[in-house]
C-alpha cells in the first residue's frame, strides 16, 4: 500500500475557521445546497438529498414561504426538520420515496414521518406528499388548505385521519390503487370520513378502483373527480347532497377498450347504468365529463335541470349514430364547449356526416371538438346546424380521414376563429362523390389509394420569431394532409382568413402568384415541410397583407442539380415582416440579393452560406438589401470563419444575430463595430477555444452574448471590460477552470445574468473564482447547485461549495507527499525494469538465500493435513454421485471404526462465501490424497480437470503424488494415462468389482491407497517415484 498523506490539525482548524467566517459575513449563498428564488421560494429539487437540509441560523429563514424538495431521496422526516421555518406556507415533498410500481427501477421503499413533523409548522397551507410510500395520513396542522396524497400507499380514509382540518379546501388522492400502483382491492373511504371537512370544495379520487361513489361527502364540494375507477352505476342517491357541485368528472369508469392507451377492463354488458335523474338536482353544475364511458345513446333526461352547464365532454364513446339524430342538446342553451372526439364506429369510415338538428340549439357554443369520428367528406350539409350558432369560435375536425373538403363552407361562419383540419387526407378541392352501394343504410365510397402521410416530428422555433396564429381573427389549419397542388378555388369565400397552415404536406408545384388569390386578408402563411418550387418572381404577390411566411424545410428543389431559384418575390411583398427560409440547404443558383423594405426578421438557418460566400463576391451582398432587418438567424450554415467584409455587408439595422452550431473556431471581435446597433450575438455551439484575440470593442451596444457550448478554456484579462452595455453573458458548457474578475473590469456591476454552469472549474484551495462568484451571486443562475467542480477528482460533479477541507493541505505537507509519491513512481519504474533484465538471476539468488534459512526444508507433517482424501467426481452423473454418497462415504467414514477416514466432499465441506477456486485449492492442499471417481476418462473437464491440474501442481511443488483413481466401468481403461499409471503405480488405480465377493478386497485396497504414500507403490523396474528433498 502506498504512502498516505495526513492533514495537520492546525491546517484543518484554519480552513474551518475561514469557512465559518465567510458564512457569518453572509457571503455564501444563504440556503446551501439549495437556491433561493423570488417570492420566498427555496428550490431544493433534484439534489439527491437524503435528509431535509438544516439551513444556517444566519440565513433569512423567516422569509421562506415555500420549500420544494421534489425528486430527492428523503426517506425519513423528523420532528425538527421544519421547525426553523416559521413562515413556511407551501411544502413540496413529491417523488422522494415512490411506491415500487412507480419507481423507475421498481425498488421497494418506505417513508417514515415522525408524529410532529408537520404539526411543528403551524403556518403550513399547502402540502404535497404525492409519489411517496406512506400508508397512513400523517398528523397535519389545522392551517392546511391544500393536501395532495396521490400515488401513495394510503388505502383507507376514516374520520380520524383528517380530524381538525377545518380550513382544508383541496384534497387530492389519485392513483393509490391502479395498474401502476397496484393493491389487493380498492381505496376504502369510510362513510362520513370527509364529512367533517366543512370547507372542502375540491376532491379528486381518480384511479382508485372505486366501485361506488363514497357516501356522506361534504355538501360544500364544488369539484368532484372520480374518473377511471369502476363505478358503472350512478343513481340520484350517489350525489344526493352535493347541490353545490360545479364540476363532475365520472369518465373512464366503463371504458371503451378498443381505444385505450393503457391497461383496460372491459365494460360489463348493459352498462353503464345512469339513472335518468342522476344529475337533475345538480342545478349549479357547469362542467360534466362522461368521456370513455361506453355510451351508445344520450338520454335527454340526463341534462334536465342543468341550465348552467357550460362544458360537456362526451369523447371516446360510441355516439357515432347518436350524433346524427340526438335531441339531447336542446336544453343546453348555455353550453360553451362540447367534446365529441373519437366517437367512431369500429372499422367503419363514414362517407358523410350529418349533425343532428339539436346542435342548432347550442346558442352559446364556442368550441366544438369532433376529431376522430372518421368521415370522409366535408360538405355544406355536414355542418349545417352549426351555421346559425352566433358564438362558435373553434371547430376541431382533425384525424377524420377526410379526403374531400369544401373549405368554402367556413365562410358562412361569421364568428369562427379557428378551424383545425390537420391530420386528414385532403388532397385538393372537393369533387363529386362516387357512390358504389349502400350497406346497412350507410353510404360507402372509394377510399384513396394513398395512405395517410406519417406525421413527422414538429420543429421547434423561436417564440419571438414567427407570430402566433392565436392573435389573429381567423385561422385554418390544413397541415399534415395529402395536398400536392393548391388551386385558388379551394379558398373561395375565405377572404376573411388571416392565418393558413399548410405544413407537412407534399406540395410540389411552382407557386406563381395565382394560388391564393381569394385570401386577400391573409397575414400568416405556413408552407414548411413541403417541396415548393420557387422559380417564379411573382410568388405570393397575390397576398398584399402577408406579414409572415414560413418556407422552411422545402429543401428538395434546392438540392436538385442545375435548377435555379428566384427569391425576388420578397421585394414585392410590401407588408412582409417575418420570413423563414430555414433548413432548405440553399447553396447556389439563387437570387444574388434579397431585397425588402419591410422585412424585420429572417431565419436562414440550416442552409450552406459557407459555400455561397466561397463564390467570391457573388453572394457577398445577399442580405444587404434588407434595409429594415432587425433579427437574423444564420445558425447551422457550416461557417468556419466570418470575415469582416461579410459582417460589413449585413444590414446596419441588425440588432439580433444568431450564429449557433456553426464551425467557427475564430471570431474577429473588433468587427462588431461594423454592426453599430447589434444588441444580441449568439455564438453557442461553435468551436471557439479561447477569447484571446483582442477584446469586445468599446462603444458596442451589445447587451446579450451567448458563448455556451464551445471549448473556451482561456479568456484575456479585460476581454469584456469595454462592453459597458453588456447585461447577459452565457459562458456555460465550456472548458473554463476558473472565472476571473479581471475579465470584466468595472462593467461587472452591469451584469444581470452570468451563466458559468457546466464548466470543469478547478476547486483548489483558495480559488479566487469562488469569492468573485459570491460577489455577483445575484447574477449567477443556479450558483449553489448548477455551478460544479471539474477537478480535483474527489470533487468532480459536486457544487463548488462542497469543497473537502481535507484536500486543503499546507505547503510543507504537500511537498512531503510529492516527494514520497515521486519516490514511489521511481520504484515503480525501476523494479519492473530490473525484473525484465535480470529477473531469473534475482529469483535464483533469492531462493538460494531462503534455502539457508533454518526450518526452510522441514517438510510439513502429516498431522497438518485436515482430510485423508478429497473426493472428486462428476456431479452431473447421478449414478456416480449416488455411489460416492451411499457406498464410498459409508464404507470409509462409518464402517471402519477407529480406522475411519476423513473425506472432503464439495457439497458438504466447502465453505460458503469463498470462491470456487479458493475452496478447490484448500481441498487439494489440505488432503493427504485426491481421489478421482471416474465412470469414463475420455471427456474430463470442469471441476475434474481443475482438480487434476492442482494435484499435478502439488506433485511439482511438494514432490508428492497424491492421485488415486477409482474406475467404475471397465471400458475406462482405454485411456493412455490410466494404462500408463497402472503400469507405473498399480495400487493407485482401482477398478470397482461388480461381483459382491470382490468388493471387500476393493475397500481394503482403497483404504491402503489412501493411507500410504504413493511413493511405496511405484514399480521399481520403471522408476523410483517422486522423492522429497531433505
Swiss-Prot record:
Lipidation sites (S-palmitoyl cysteine): 257, 264
Primary subcellular site in the record, as a coarse category: endoplasmic reticulum
Intrachain S-S bonds: 34-44, 97-109, 177-183, 254-267, 257-264, 469-499, 763-789, 765-808
Membrane-crossing segments per the record: 817-837
UniProt GO molecular function: interleukin-1 receptor binding; pattern recognition receptor activity; protein homodimerization activity; siRNA binding; unmethylated CpG binding
Cytoplasmic side: 838-1030
Residues carrying covalently attached carbohydrate according to the record: 63, 128, 199, 209, 241, 339, 512, 566, 668, 693, 730
GO cellular component, one term: endolysosome
Signal sequence region: 1-24
Topology of this chain in the membrane: Single-pass type I membrane protein
Coiled coil: none
Ranges of the Extracellular topological domain: 25-816
Family annotation (Pfam families): LRR_1, LRR_12, LRR_8, TIR
SUPFAM superfamilies hit by this protein: L domain-like, Toll/Interleukin receptor TIR domain
Any GO BP annotation: positive regulation of intestinal epithelial cell development
Sequence ranges assigned to domain TIR in this UniProt record: 865-1010
Reported modifications of this chain: Activated by proteolytic cleavage of the flexible loop between repeats LRR14 and LRR15 within the ectodomain. Cleavage requires UNC93B1. Proteolytically processed by first removing the majority of the ectodomain by either asparagine endopeptidase (AEP) or a cathepsin followed by a trimming event that is solely cathepsin mediated and required for optimal receptor signaling.
Subcellular location: Endoplasmic reticulum membrane; Endosome; Lysosome; Cytoplasmic vesicle, Phagosome
Per-repeat ranges for LRR: 61-84, 86-109, 121-146, 149-165, 166-189, 197-220, 222-241, 242-267, 282-305, 307-331, 332-355, 362-385, 389-412, 414-439, 469-493, 495-518, 519-542, 544-571, 573-597, 599-621, 626-649, 651-674, 675-698, 700-722, 723-746, 748-771
Keywords: Cytoplasmic vesicle, Disulfide bond, Endoplasmic reticulum, Endosome, Glycoprotein, Immunity, Inflammatory response, Innate immunity, Leucine-rich repeat, Lipoprotein, Lysosome, Membrane, Palmitate, Receptor, Repeat, Signal, Transmembrane, Transmembrane helix
Positions bound to DNA: 46-50, 71-76, 94-108, 131, 151, 178-180, 207, 261
Task performed by this protein: Key component of innate and adaptive immunity. TLRs (Toll-like receptors) control host immune response against pathogens through recognition of molecular patterns specific to microorganisms. TLR9 is a nucleotide-sensing TLR which is activated by unmethylated cytidine-phosphate-guanosine (CpG) dinucleotides. Acts via MYD88 and TRAF6, leading to NF-kappa-B activation, cytokine secretion and the inflammatory response. Upon CpG stimulation, induces B-cell proliferation, activation, survival and antibody production.
Protein family according to the UniProt entry: Belongs to the Toll-like receptor family.
Quaternary structure note: Monomer and homodimer. Exists as a monomer in the absence of unmethylated cytidine-phosphate-guanosine (CpG) ligand. Proteolytic processing of an insertion loop (Z-loop) is required for homodimerization upon binding to the unmethylated CpG ligand leading to its activation. Interacts with MYD88 via their respective TIR domains. Interacts with BTK. Interacts (via transmembrane domain) with UNC93B1. Interacts with CD300LH; the interaction may promote full activation of TLR9-triggered innate responses.
Name of the protein in its database record: Toll-like receptor 9
Organism: Sus scrofa
Gene for this chain: TLR9
Amino acid at each position: 500500500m502506498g504512502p498516505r498523506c495526513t492533514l495537520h490539525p492546525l491546517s484543518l482548524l484554519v480552513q474551518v475557521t475561514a469557512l465559518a467566517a465567510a458564512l457569518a459575513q453572509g457571503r455564501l449563498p444563504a440556503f446551501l445546497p439549495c437556491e433561493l428564488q423570488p417570492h420566498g421560494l427555496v428550490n431544493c429539487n433534484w439534489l439527491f438529498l437524503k435528509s431535509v437540509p438544516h439551513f444556517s441560523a444566519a440565513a433569512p429563514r423567516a422569509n421562506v414561504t415555500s420549500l420544494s424538495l421534489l425528486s430527492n431521496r428523503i426517506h425519513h422526516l423528523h420532528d425538527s426538520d421544519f421547525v426553523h421555518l416559521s413562515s413556511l406556507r407551501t411544502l413540496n415533498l413529491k417523488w422522494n420515496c415512490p411506491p415500487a410500481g412507480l419507481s423507475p427501477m421498481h425498488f421497494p421503499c418506505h417513508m417514515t414521518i415522525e408524529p410532529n413533523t408537520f404539526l411543528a409548522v403551524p403556518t403550513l397551507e399547502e402540502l404535497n406528499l404525492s409519489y411517496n410510500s406512506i400508508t397512513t395520513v400523517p398528523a397535519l396542522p389545522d392551517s392546511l388548505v391544500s393536501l395532495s396524497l396521490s400515488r401513495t400507499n394510503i388505502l383507507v380514509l376514516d374520520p380520524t385521519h383528517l380530524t381538525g382540518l377545518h380550513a382544508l379546501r383541496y384534497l387530492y388522492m389519485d392513483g393509490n390503487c391502479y395498474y401502476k400502483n397496484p393493491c389487493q382491492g380498492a381505496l376504502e373511504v369510510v362513510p362520513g370520513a370527509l364529512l367533517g371537512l366543512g370547507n372542502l370544495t375540491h376532491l379528486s379520487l381518480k384511479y382508485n378502483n372505486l366501485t361506488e361513489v363514497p357516501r356522506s361527502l361534504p355538501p360544500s364540494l364544488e369539484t368532484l373527480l372520480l374518473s377511471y375507477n369502476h363505478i358503472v352505476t350512478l343513481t340520484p342517491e350517489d350525489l344526493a347532497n352535493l347541490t353545490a357541485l360545479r364540476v363532475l368528472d365520472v369518465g373512464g369508469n366503463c371504458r371503451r377498450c378498443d381505444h385505450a392507451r393503457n391497461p383496460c377492463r372491459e365494460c360489463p354488458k348493459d352498462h353503464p347504468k345512469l339513472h335518468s335523474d342522476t344529475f337533475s338536482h345538480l342545478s349549479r353544475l357547469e362542467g360534466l365529463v362522461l368521456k370513455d364511458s361506453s355510451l351508445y345513446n344520450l338520454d335527454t333526461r340526463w341534462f334536465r335541470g342543468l341550465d348552467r352547464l357550460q362544458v360537456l365532454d362526451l369523447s371516446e364513446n360510441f355516439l357515432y349514430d347518436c350524433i346524427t339524430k340526438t335531441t339531447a342538446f336542446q336544453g343546453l342553451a348555455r353550453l360553451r364547449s362540447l367534446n365529441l372526439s373519437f366517437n367512431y364506429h369500429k372499422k367503419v369510415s363514414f362517407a358523410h356526416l350529418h349533425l343532428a338538428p339539436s346542435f342548432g340549439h347550442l346558442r352559446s357554443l364556442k368550441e366544438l371538438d369532433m376529431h376522430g369520428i372518421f368521415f370522409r367528406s366535408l360538405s355544406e350539409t355536414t355542418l349545417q346546424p352549426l351555421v346559425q350558432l352566433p358564438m362558435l369560435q373553434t371547430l376541431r375536425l382533425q384525424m377524420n380521414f377526410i379526403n374531400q373538403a369544401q373549405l368554402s363552407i367556413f365562410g358562412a361562419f361569421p364568428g369562427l376563429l379557428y378551424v383545425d383540419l390537420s391530420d386528414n387526407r385532403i388532397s385538393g378541392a372537393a369533387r363529386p362523390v362516387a357512390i358504389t352501394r349502400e350497406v346497412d343504410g350507410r353510404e360507402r365510397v372509394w377510399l384513396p389509394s394513398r395512405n395517410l402521410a406519417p406525421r413527422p416530428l414538429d420543429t421547434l422555433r423561436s417564440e419571438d420569431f414567427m407570430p402566433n396564429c392565436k392573435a389573429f381573427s381567423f385561422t385554418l389549419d390544413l397541415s399534415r394532409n395529402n395536398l400536392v397542388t393548391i388551386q385558388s378555388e379551394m379558398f373561395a369565400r375565405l377572404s376573411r382568413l388571416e392565418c393558413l397552415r399548410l405544413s407537412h404536406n407534399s406540395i410540389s408545384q411552382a407557386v406563381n402568384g395565382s394560388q391564393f388569390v381569394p385570401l386577400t386578408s391573409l397575414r400568416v402563411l405556413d408552407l414548411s415541410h413541403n417541396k415548393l418550387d420557387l422559380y417564379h418572381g411573382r410568388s405570393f404577390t397575390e397576398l398584399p397583407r402577408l406579414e409572415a411566411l414560413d418556407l422552411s424545410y422545402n429543401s428538395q428543389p434546392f438540392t436538385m442539380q442545375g435548377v435555379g431559384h428566384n427569391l425576388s418575390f420578397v421585394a414585392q411583398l410590401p407588408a412582409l415582416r417575418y420570413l423563414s427560409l430555414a433548413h432548405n440547404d440553399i447553396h447556389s443558383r439563387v437570387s444574388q440579393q434579397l431585397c425588402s423594405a419591410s422585412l424585420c426578421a429572417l431565419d436562414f438557418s440550416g442552409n450552406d452560406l459557407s459555400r455561397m460566400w466561397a463564390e467570391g463576391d457573388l453572394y457577398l451582398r445577399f442580405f444587404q438589401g434588407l434595409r429594415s432587418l432587425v433579427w437574423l438567424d444564420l445558425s447551422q450554415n457550416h461557417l468556419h470563419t466570418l470575415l469582416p467584409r461579410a459582417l460589413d455587408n449585413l444590414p446596419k439595422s441588425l440588432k439580433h444575430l444568431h450564429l449557433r452550431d456553426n464551425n467557427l473556431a475564430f471570431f474577429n471581435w473588433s468587427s462588431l463595430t461594423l454592426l453599430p446597433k447589434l444588441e444580441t450575438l449568439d455564438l453557442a455551439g461553435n468551436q471557439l477555444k479561447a477569447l484571446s484575440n483582442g477584446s469586445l470593442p468599446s462603444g458596442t451596444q451589445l447587451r446579450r452574448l451567448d458563448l455556451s457550448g464551445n471549448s473556451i478554456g482561456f479568456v484575456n484579462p479585460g476581454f469584456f471590460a469595454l462592453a459597458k452595455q453588456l447585461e447577459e453573458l452565457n459562458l456555460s458548457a465550456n472548458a473554463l477552470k476558473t472565472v476571473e474578475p479581471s475579465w470584466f473590469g468595472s462593467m461587472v456591476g452591469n451584469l444581470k445574468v452570468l451563466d458559468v454552469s457546466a464548466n470543469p472549474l478547478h476547486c483548489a484551495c483558495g480559488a479566487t473564482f469562488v469569492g468573485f462568484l459570491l460577489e455577483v451571486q445575484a447574477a449567477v443562475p443556479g450558483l449553489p447547485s448548477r455551478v460544479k467542480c471539474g477537478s480535483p477528482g474527489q470533487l468532480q460533479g459536486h457544487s463548488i461549495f462542497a469543497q473537502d477541507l481535507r484536500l486543503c493541505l499546507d505547503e510543507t505537507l504537500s511537498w512531503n507527499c510529492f516527494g514520497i509519491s515521486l519516490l514511489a513512481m521511481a520504484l515503480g519504474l525501476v523494479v519492473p525494469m530490473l525484473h525484465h533484465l535480470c529477473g531469473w538471476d534475482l529469483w535464483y539468488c533469492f531462493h538460494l538465500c531462503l534455502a539457508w534459512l533454518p526450518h526452510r526444508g522441514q517438510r510439513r507433517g502429516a498431522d497438518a493435513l485436515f482430510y485423508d482424501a478429497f473426493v472428486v467426481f462428476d456431479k452431473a452423473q447421478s449414478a456416480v454421485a449416488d455411489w460416492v454418497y451411499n457406498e464410498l462415504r459409508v464404507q470409509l467414514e462409518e464402517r471402519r471404526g477407529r480406522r475411519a477416514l476423513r473425506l472432503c466432499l464439495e457439497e458438504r465441506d466447502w465453505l460458503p462465501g469463498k470462491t470456487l477456486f479458493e475452496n478447490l485449492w484448500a481441498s487439494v492442499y489440505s488432503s493427504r490424497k485426491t481421489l478421482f471417481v471416474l465412470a469414463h476418462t475420455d471427456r474430463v473437464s470442469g471441476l475434474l480437470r481443475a482438480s487434476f491440474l492442482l494435484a499435478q501442481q502439488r506433485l511439482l511443488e511438494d514432490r508428492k503424488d497424491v492421485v488415486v483413481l477409482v474406475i467404475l466401468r471397465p471400458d475406462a481403461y482405454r485411456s493412455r494415462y490410466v494404462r500408463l499409471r497402472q503400469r507405473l503405480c498399480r495400487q493407485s488405480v482401482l477398478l470397482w468389482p461388480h461381483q459382491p465377493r470382490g468388493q471387500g478386497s476393493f475397500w481394503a485396497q482403497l483404504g491402503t491407497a489412501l493411507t500410504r504414500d504413493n511413493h511405496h507403490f511405484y514399480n521399481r523396474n520403471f522408476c523410483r517415484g517422486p522423492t522429497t528433498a531433505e
